[in-house]
């Protein structure tokens, strides 16, 4: 997975 370091707030639960 290529996710930017910063968009890790509020995971899709």
UniProtKB/Swiss-Prot annotation:
Which residues does the record list as Leucine amide (modified residue)? 13
Protein's cellular compartments:
Secreted
Q: Which GO terms describe its cellular component?
A: extracellular region
Asked whether the UniProt record includes rRNA-binding among its keywords, one would answer no
* One example of a Gene Ontology biological process annotation: neuropeptide signaling pathway
What are the entry keywords? Amidation, Neuropeptide, Secreted
Record flagged with keyword Aminoacyl-tRNA synthetase: no
Q: What does this protein do?
A: Myoactive.
> Could you say which protein family the record assigns here?
Belongs to the pyrokinin family.
The name this protein carries in UniProt is Pyrokinin-4
């Amino acid at each position: 997975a290529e996710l930017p370091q910063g968009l890790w707030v509020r995971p899709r639960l």
